[in-house]
């Protein structure tokens, strides 16, 4: 039932020993391991030296984050006040939030585009915005236009930062 034949190649202690004793094969393995370790060391040193450039690049990426309850749009964060305030109180409240009333200097292509946000996140209404006018008047934003309004009138407001 069982054969006494020897199958060459399956178990051959002489060949196995010959491979392990071959010093040139071991030298090649050491050289390859040395190359791998060397490239890893060079990569680590390079990353350590140029780490500041890596951080700078990440800081320049266009991802921005807004605080809770703020809306991000076009690299600007907006806060839509849901209570009515007169112009001065709205402006002061925005300052407490480390922001300003949305203004014509905000990095927004067109301030009236915020109306789309007001419809999405609040409701269509009049909003105080900061715009250069004479002393006792300011501008309210409504229906894609600017309208003069007395500063003592209470309206909703939009802060930006």
From Swiss-Prot:
InterPro entries from the UniProt entry: C-type_lectin-like/link_sf, C-type_lectin/matrix_domain, CTDL_fold
Chain segments annotated as transmembrane: 31-51
Annotated GO CC locations: host cell endoplasmic reticulum membrane; membrane
Record carries keyword Membrane: yes
Positions of the UniProt region annotated as Lectin-like: 66-160
Cytoplasmic compartment spans: 1-30
Family to which this protein belongs: Belongs to the asfivirus lectin-like protein family.
Name recorded for this polypeptide: Lectin-like protein EP153R
């Amino acid at each position: 039932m069982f054969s006494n034949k020897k199958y060459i190649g399956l178990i051959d202690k002489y060949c196995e020993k010959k491979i392990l004793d071959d010093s040139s094969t071991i030298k090649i393995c050491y050289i390859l391991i040395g190359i791998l370790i060397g490239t890893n060391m060079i990569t680590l040193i390079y990353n350590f030296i140029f780490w500041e450039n890596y951080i700078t690049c990440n800081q320049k990426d266009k991802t921005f984050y807004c605080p809770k309850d703020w809306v991000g749009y076009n690299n600007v964060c907006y806060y839509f006040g849901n209570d009515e305030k007169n112009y001065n109180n709205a402006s002061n409240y925005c300052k407490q939030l480390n922001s300003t009333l949305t203004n014509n200097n905000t990095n927004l292509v067109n301030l009236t585009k915020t109306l789309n946000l007001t419809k999405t996140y609040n409701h269509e209404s009049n909003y105080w915005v900061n715009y250069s006018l004479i002393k006792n008047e300011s501008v309210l934003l409504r229906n894609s236009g600017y309208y003069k309004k007395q500063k003592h009138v209470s309206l909703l407001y939009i802060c930006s930062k």
